[in-house]
């Protein structure tokens, strides 16, 4: 039986979630979309043409206050507040919260008040709402948790890799840098950005140092690593795909070959479908559209001694 979902927000994540759900209708039924700035013809245009993922293959038209995809009709609403949305009437039970505006339990509870049963925040929560990363701590999920966070794209890449390394060798300390593709909040020319002045600099001709909460979030989903990891971000002028650079001091002496073997084993067993092990000469565009949250690059790691290692893992920061 298909899971009945509603999508709140129609930015990059909302549109990608819709694309993926429509590809597997036996698993997901999209009951409704809420888009505050609704213009159905523009929504059709944004779905049909995508600068990163290419032209959408299905027929799509605007029809009767909604979108028609071949034989699938999805109603579209224009609500400013989640508690005004008819989730209950449409049958939507699980809400993909992708606006970026609802990051706390109190805010997401408005979806529940409107008839939804569960809410998945597609970003780190701003409060203590439970955070889960598949392959890392998803077995801790309980059915009474009605608002959860799926963490960030970077955390979903970093945490599975960190778990494999920590479980096998132990991590004493770790530093992480994500070399991250541009995002929608960045500016095409120098402009004001109050929270982070450097993020306000032009995206096309700068490498921009910034912050990331991904390493700290690893300490939430893997509590024994709390306080042992920290990191930063370098924003670069590419449209999609990012790479995690993890440097760690290990508790157990080992070799780089043994580390690669541990990651490969995990990719074939308990992390299958989450980690992909790659030993080819790859570059960033090779991972556009990758379903894996963590694409381990076996050829790019380096090691000094038997306890100090640098590891690289790629991820599609939109699709993955």
Features from the language model and the residues they span:
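Conserved active-site and cofactor/substrate-binding residues in soluble primary-metabolism enzymes
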Residues: 8, 90, 106, 152-160, ...
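C-terminal active-site/capping subdomain that shapes the small-molecule cofactor and substrate pocket
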Residues: 231, 243, 247-320
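Alpha-helical scaffold segments in soluble metabolic enzymes
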Residues: 16, 20, 45, 110, ...
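Short clusters of hydrophobic/aromatic residues that line enzyme substrate/ligand-binding pockets
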Residues: 67, 132-134, 147, 189, ...
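A structural supersecondary motif
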Residues: 223-233
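Glycine-rich beta-alpha junction loops
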Residues: 36-39, 82, 125-126, 152-154, ...
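N-terminal Rossmann-like NAD(P) cofactor-binding subdomain of oxidoreductases
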Residues: 1-200, 302-303
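Glycine-rich phosphate/diphosphate-binding loops and the adjacent beta-loop-alpha structural elements
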Residues: 193, 197-206, 238-249
């Amino acid at each position: 039986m298909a899971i009945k979902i509603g999508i709140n927000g129609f930015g990059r994540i909302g549109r990608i979630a819709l694309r993926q759900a429509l590809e597997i209708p036996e698993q997901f039924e999209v009951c409704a979309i809420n888009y505050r700035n609704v213009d159905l013809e523009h929504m059709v245009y944004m779905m049909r043409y995508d600068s990163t993922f290419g032209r959408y293959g299905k027929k799509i038209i605007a029809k009767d206050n909604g979108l028609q995809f071949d034989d699938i009709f999805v109603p579209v609403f224009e609500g400013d507040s989640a508690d005004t949305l008819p989730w209950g009437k449409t049958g939507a039970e699980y809400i993909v919260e992708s606006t970026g505006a609802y990051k706390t339990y109190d805010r997401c509870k408005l979806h529940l008040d409107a008839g939804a049963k569960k809410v998945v925040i597609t970003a780190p929560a701003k409060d203590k709402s439970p955070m889960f990363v598949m392959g890392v701590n998803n077995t801790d999920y309980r059915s009474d948790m009605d608002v959860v966070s799926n963490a960030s794209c970077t955390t979903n890449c970093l945490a599975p890799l960190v778990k494999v390394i920590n479980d096998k060798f132990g991590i004493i300390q770790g530093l992480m840098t994500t070399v991250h593709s541009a995002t929608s909040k960045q500016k095409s020319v120098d402009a004001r950005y109050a929270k982070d002045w450097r993020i306000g600099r032009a995206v096309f001709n700068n490498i921009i140092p910034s912050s990331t909460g991904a390493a700290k979030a690893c300490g939430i989903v893997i509590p024994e690593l709390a306080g042992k990891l920290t990191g930063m971000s370098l924003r670069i002028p590419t449209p999609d795909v990012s790479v995690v650079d993890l440097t760690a001091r290990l508790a157990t002496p080992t070799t780089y070959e043994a580390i690669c073997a541990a990651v490969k084993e995990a990719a074939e067993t308990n992390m299958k479908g989450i980690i992909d092990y790659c030993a080819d000469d790859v570059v960033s565009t090779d991972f556009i559209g990758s379903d894996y949250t963590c694409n381990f690059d076996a050829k790019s790691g380096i090691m000094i001694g038997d306890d100090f290692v640098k590891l690289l893992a790629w991820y599609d920061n939109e699709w993955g």
